[in-house]
Amino acid sequence: MKMLDLYGYTSIAQSFDKICISIASPESIRAMSYGEIKDISTTNYRTFKVEKGGLFCPKIFGPVNDDECLCGKYRKKRYRGVICEKCGVEVTSSKVRRERMGHIELVSPVAHVWFLKSLPSRIGALLDMPLKLIESILYSGDFVVIDPIATPLSKGEVISESAYNQAKDNYGEDSFIALTGAEAIRELLVRLDLHAINANLRSELESTTSEMKRKKIVKRLRIVENFINSGNKPEWMILTVIPILPPDLRPLVSLENGRPAVSDLNHHYRTIINRNNRLGKLLKLNPPAIMIRNEKRMLQEAVDALFDSTRRSYVSNKAGSVGYKKSLSDMLKGKQGRFRQNLLGKRVDYSGRSVIVVGPNLKLHQCGLPKKMALELFKPFICSKLKMYGIVPTVKLANKMIQNEKPEVWDILDEVIHEHPILLNRAPTLHRLGIQAFDPVLIEGKAIQLHPLVCSAFNADFDGDQMAVHIPLSLEAQLEARILMMSTNNILSPSNGKPIIVPSKDIILGIYYLTLQDYVEPEEILFFGDFSHVEYALHNKDIHICSKIKYKMNYCTDSSDGNGPTYYSKIVETTPGRLMLWQIFPEHKNLTFDLVNQVLTVKEITAIVDLVYRSCGQSETVEFSDKLMSLGFRYASQSGISFGRMDMIIPDTKTMHVDNASEKIKEFAVQYQDGLITKSERYNKVIDEWSKCTDLIAKDMMKAISVYDEESKLNSIYMMAHSGARGSASQMKQLAGMRGLMAKPSGEIIETPIISNFREGLNVFEYFNSTHGARKGLADTALKTANSGYLTRRLVDVAQDCIVVEYDCKTHNGFAMRSVIDGGTVVETLDNIILGRVAAVDIYNPITKELLVNAGELIDEAKVEKIRIAGLDAVKVRSPLTCEAKKGICALCYGRDLAIGDVVSIGEAVGVIAAQSVGEPGTQLTMRTFHVGGTAMRGVETSNLIAMLDAKVKLVNSNVVEDKYGNKIVMSRSCDVVLLDSVGNEKMRHSVPYGARLYVNDGQLVKITEKIADWDPYTMPIITEKTGIIKYMDLIDGVSINEVLDESTGISNRVVVDWKLHLQGANLRPRLVLVNDNGDIITLSSGLEANYFIPIGAVLSVQDGQKVHAGDVITRIPRESIKTRDITGGLPRVIELFEARRPKEHAIVSDIDGYVEFGKDYYRSKRRIFIKPVDDKLSPVEYLVPKGKHTIVNEGDFVHKGDLLMDGDPDPHDILRVLGVEALANYMIAEIQQVYRLQGVRIDNKHIEVILRQMLQKVEIFEPGDTMYLVGENVDVEEVLKTNSNMEKIGKSPAKYIPILQGITRASLDTNSFVSAASFQETTKVLTEAAFSGKEDSLYGLKENVIVGRLIPAGTGFLMNKIKKLSLLNKDDYSMYYNSEYQDLASIEAGHACSVSPSQGVSDTSGAVDY
């Protein structure tokens, strides 16, 4: 324990392990109190002294001044503990006025508003009475029968006052007991036998068959059991004594004009005391009952107002209005409440803020701190040094010396700040890189200087941004700042493991310019053998930086025979600029000259920084980055790149492309007028045509702009965009191409595009259309920033207690990872997905059977390369979702800590990192919406499938018919085209929609770019399987089908309308039937009749009696016009997924494998679908689909478990129920990543998996077995496993359960820690629940520990807790514990020296000392 004392660790905050909460009994309130308060007086208006016996009474609460009684008789420390015989005040510290409580003895009991009105009403549940009735007893003067004695009245019956008087007259004065007000409720609660109620409810639960009744019983039973288990008594919910807060927590402050500013609580207490005293006096006078009842009601309302003003039945002033008085609940909840304002976030001393300016001369670990600021911040340090050196005798003189800025002060300041890191923070701090440590360098001026490379981590720019400075004071804080938070230790981004200290903007432009090469061949190419000669030639202007030269490059390789390295040289064709860049590279065999001998854009430069980090380690990377930055800045200035109007080159082909598009659009208009296409089809085709036209113009513009010109060399704007320094192809397209389509605020695309570009200038109409996008961008920014910030807060709250608690949980479970293919193209390779994960099983090469990776081994870059060469298409890796560690996760299931590039350290708060990684880009993207200027960024709908490589085709679930033109038409709803390589490994898989034309056969070999299939992207067809004659069934004009006349074309289409709106439409089943020449219904290959059911909104393509051929389209269902997809649409999608909300019109998922059969009858407004299982012994599963919804299956189709039966997004809860956790994880990850990928943001899957793990912490009991659980109860997974294990040990049957998915808000509120839940949302509800359940908080998470003022149990705090545990054990336990846990921990920590070791710090050459 001595070691802990060294850090002052055994403070009060450390001396307890749990926090318990329960309802305060009247006895405990009196025991806590130092005296009863009966007087409302506060201070004397003349002397301003506090009044005795009043709300600030010093006799009860303690002295106002330290060690001084009220009358002044005793005035020194030596009298401590003495109680003055004159004024009765104890002589002690005035601090006791923050701790000592008082109380009010109520004349009549009152109900506690939290237990009465916080839904579900706890009092109501115990008494089995509706809240309305209880309120009528409390507030309206109704009576409740407590004991009917010999009358026909029943116990608990509520009667009005007139009925009560009538009963008294009928049965006599004492023939029954009935009471009103809180006394009545209290009497009922006192008489409750909770154990008997519990037994009755359990037997009722077993016998009931009604689901609704069962839910009601379970709710009540849970409350009854909580009361029994917690030891709380029901009558304690009715107050007979009210505690009074210590006076210093509700102070009386005098304002400048002498008037007192009174805390709202004092107002509430005065009202209660006044009404209580008045009621007491009234009772002595024996007045009419109505007066007493009214006074009791007023007392009840006054107490309600004190505890929770918002829950009173009559609220005179609503929250936020002028006369509103804050209640105790208001003090706790919300952003300004005690939890969030004072406990989770505090204002800090030793801090300052100022504007930031760029500091290009700083090293990466430095920041420029203004001298004046440093002087103020380090004042106490300077004072102590001045005293220590004997320069001044007192602190007062030292302060004066600092104020006068004497020369000695500056010398001491230099000494003080040496090796003393400071923290810089820029708001909003969206991820952990928003606060970093730097070594301060004193500068003149008043602005903080920031290193340019850390700007992207802070998301800072120099247009007036401000940053805050904080000083770590204690030795431990300085140590943590230097080892963990130093900017040089934060090179990689925690969200994706890519370098975040990468050059950008000017630096990129400078390096790009440096690596350019002249396109014009020189008359003679000069040879150089040494770099000094190249520098000499450059100085003499014999060559230019971009000139082509030949250079003798020396190489060194390790010889295979083990005789040491071999040296050789080679002539390379390069430029002086590239050689100059090569000089700053560190020496390593992975870093070859080929890396530099190319034009470097931002992508290549990022890859180089990454490679340097992986190969040479941290200190080399830091040095390299600094040198790269200096070089970039230098050559960006020297290049003379500028931005001119004539640099925006408008392509000559623009007019041609616009004319062609206009012609096509006229064609579409004609087709529409002829009735060949519908209105929405025409709209979609127009949008697509303009998108194509814009893209063609952009392509031609890029071609024109990227031409190398002998006079002006490369185009400046092209260089900026191509290098990735500033601007994008889409912005250039708007400058010199064509602005393109614009979106309305609703998200619809306006079909008239903006043909002009910014160089030509927009006309009035085009300018007006542009305003939509600009305005939407600004409005989005304002609204969505708040949404995104709130999402981050919820994510942090749900994941904050997810910490790495052990190295290996020994599980063999995991998920099979595959590359992500979207629209036939690989959007995320398998390499990227498995890098940094741990193999769940041994991985072998499928051909050579060579072992590539052992189970439990980390897959690093080298192993990824092996797996790629082996051609594996799926790899099983461990995942946080399958981790079996208790109260956290294990290091191996998490894998690599992306910020350090090695297995994650034990004690790492991976939950918070995951939440920040997912939340941070959301905010960034929403702030960035308007940069594209709102031009419609919609891609052209994919309508075909092209082979991306030479391969063999494999068709899965293909059911094909041939139409009259000989085309193969896909009739299957789940047809997949798989492309296999020569070995037979799956390289690409694409689903082909129903109705597509197929150009290949199963087993056919295809060449790259060969077309495999195509389809109409704007409509969903219904296609005949056989040749025959169409017959309309239940398609009645004016009821189920309408001739919809298009006014603009005069053409009418036959559209199916909602037939349920008509009286005669109730039993209709609109369908097309296929008959033969005799009029008999044709039987399909599945053995079913050819009935084609038509949904609402479908357009019929055939007439009644028309002959059709197999493969003909008989009905078209238009798809909706596609809206613009940007993160504005994307952020709500991410929120919807994390909140596990049921999509508005969600698709129905098949629970089993089987054949589709449509029910013969309609069930009210629903349509029946049966899935008939393959096994005839099993009964079919019935689904009810809303009438008119388009089912995407036909009668007789075979569907697999988990297939969709109708259009729409599947419900995540259904996926979990039907297909399990892995399928749910795959779906959620795919959907969330799709939104981020659309914006070019990369987040590692493991972060989403960590959040999902927290969302899957609860299970639902469906069979309790011999346990005490109830059916339908939601319980923690760990708790159930523990209970089941105990049950099995004693030979009893365990509980059976299914996993459930909770949204992040629900999961945060259902956490085991009531302290954490209360500080999140619904504070009063959470505390009410916790109090009557007598909950314990074991303080496992981060938030709870911050609130109680301890070190968080992550990082340093995690190890401290280990040491604390060790120190409390006796010798035998100690050695056992040490061998099992600590040994393991020590070995891992040693292995993780890379994250904290001195050698990884900044090396001497960069200006810092090894620490």
Swiss-Prot record:
Catalytic activities: RNA(n) + a ribonucleoside 5'-triphosphate = RNA(n+1) + diphosphate
Binding residue positions for Zn(2+) 1: C69, C71, C84, C87
Assigned GO CC terms: DNA-directed RNA polymerase complex
Co-factor binding comment: Binds 1 Mg(2+) ion per subunit.
SUPFAM superfamilies the UniProt entry points to: beta and beta-prime subunits of DNA dependent RNA-polymerase
Top enzyme category: transferase
Cofactor: Mg(2+); Zn(2+)
GO terms for biological process, alphabetical: DNA-templated transcription
UniProt xrefs under InterPro entries: DNA-dir_RpoC_beta_prime (IPR045867), DNA-dir_RpoC_beta_prime_bact (IPR012754), RNA_pol_asu (IPR000722), RNA_pol_N (IPR006592), RNA_pol_Rpb1_1 (IPR007080), RNA_pol_Rpb1_3 (IPR007066), RNA_pol_Rpb1_3_sf (IPR042102), RNA_pol_Rpb1_4 (IPR007083)
EC assignment: 2.7.7.6
Alphabetized Pfam families for the sequence: RNA_pol_Rpb1_1 (PF04997), RNA_pol_Rpb1_2 (PF00623), RNA_pol_Rpb1_3 (PF04983), RNA_pol_Rpb1_4 (PF05000), RNA_pol_Rpb1_5 (PF04998)
Binding site for Mg(2+): D461, D463, D465
Molecular function via GO: DNA binding; DNA-directed RNA polymerase activity; magnesium ion binding; zinc ion binding
NCBIfam families, A to Z: rpoC_TIGR (TIGR02386)
The protein's role, per its UniProt record: DNA-dependent RNA polymerase catalyzes the transcription of DNA into RNA using the four ribonucleoside triphosphates as substrates.
HAMAP family to which the protein is assigned, alphabetical: RNApol_bact_RpoC
Family of this protein: Belongs to the RNA polymerase beta' chain family.
Subunit description: The RNAP catalytic core consists of 2 alpha, 1 beta, 1 beta' and 1 omega subunit. When a sigma factor is associated with the core the holoenzyme is formed, which can initiate transcription.
Name of this chain's protein: DNA-directed RNA polymerase subunit beta'
